Design a protein with these regions (language model features):
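CE4/NodB-like, metal-dependent polysaccharide N-deacetylase domain
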Residues: 13-34, 56-61
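Beta/alpha (TIM)-barrel catalytic core signal, keyed to glycine-rich beta->alpha loops juxtaposed to Asp/Glu
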Residues: 35-216, 220-229, 233, 244, ...
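Intrinsic disorder at enzyme termini
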Residues: 285-286
Length: 294
């Protein structure tokens, strides 16, 4: 489970939340417990409320087996946290072949930082919110030419799972077909070859140039929007039009406008950008969406 650091108000929240989680899960301890979504700002919150001290104490009392944190920031901030808190057993990172060379996500640099500190790695977003399933047609063709017996998603998850020091690869599955697909290639896992790894990184660089707005649809931005703008949905429509996956999304855009705030309603308060794990320039991107569809 995880301690929602960004939403803590007082130091006492940690103990209250933790014991509620134990009760709801019906367990006496957690195998893995992490501080949720640390970045340079949330790290200060964790320090302010003694979150590191608390989870270390819970580990000492046998209520947690391994402690760590999920992370969304640059490698230098990760290095700072791991240097100041060597007691951490693992770190959860966003790693996929699309973000491997990304200047904002810094998958490669963050992974190398965790390895330097000798930490186990838990990987989130291996298919980047579905972006590495719904790839451009030319990329899909290249993957099928490489091995037509494997799904598009399998390449992304195998890329993550092939890295050393990786303990777990988290995969969000929405149906049994996806579950069975994951089992098919992970049951007797075959790591990528060096050639395959290099090929996927090159594909990632290619895909990154084709994605207009690299949103993962995590929805962190939407709950606090004062204008009820469904930001990820608008970005998805914009990307599909730009990638020519569908040339006309006007009807869907109109439906969204009727049920939610529209991009032009944005008052530029910036709350969405403060919580975005991808560090997207959401305000300016909403203007792009409006220009495209209005």
């Amino acid at each position: 489970d995880k301690l929602p650091v960004p939403f803590m108000k007082v130091k006492e929240d940690a103990q209250k939340i933790f014991y509620e989680q134990l009760e709801k899960c019906g367990v006496e301890y957690f195998d893995y417990y992490l501080l949720h979504s640390l970045n340079r700002n949330h790290y200060q919150t964790a320090l302010k409320f003694d979150c590191f001290v608390f989870i270390k104490k819970m580990k000492e009392e046998g209520k947690i087996k391994e402690i760590g944190f999920s992370f969304h920031d640059t490698a230098d901030i990760l290095d700072q946290i791991l240097t100041e808190h060597p007691e951490m057993d693992f770190v959860q990172l966003q790693i996929n072949y699309l973000d491997w060379n990304s200047d904002s996500v810094q998958s490669k640099l963050c992974y190398e930082t965790a390895v330097k500190h000798g930490k186990k790695v838990v990987i989130m977003e291996p298919v980047k919110g579905g972006s590495l399933v719904h790839v451009p047609e030319d990329v899909k063709t290249k993957l099928f030419n490489l091995d037509n017996s494997l799904s598009v998603a399998s390449w992304a998850i195998r890329f993550a799972a092939s890295l050393k020091n990786v303990r777990v690869v988290l995969s969000g599955m929405s149906n049994l077909e996806q579950l069975y697909d994951n089992i098919s290639y992970m049951k007797e896992f075959k790591p990528l070859t060096q050639e395959e790894n290099k090929f996927l990184i090159q594909l990632g660089d290619q895909i990154r140039t084709s994605i207009a707005i690299p949103c993962t649809a995590c929805n962190y931005c939407t709950p606090g929007c004062p204008k009820n703008i469904c930001i990820p949905e608008y970005f998805s429509l914009y990307n599909k039009r730009k990638q020519t996956l569908s040339k006309d999304k006007s009807d869907e855009y109109d439906n969204l406008k009727n049920e939610h705030g529209k991009p032009l309603d944005c008052i530029e308060c910036g709350q969405c950008e403060r919580v975005c794990p991808q560090k997207l320039l959401i305000i300016s991107n909403l203007k792009k969406v409006a220009e495209e569809f209005e």
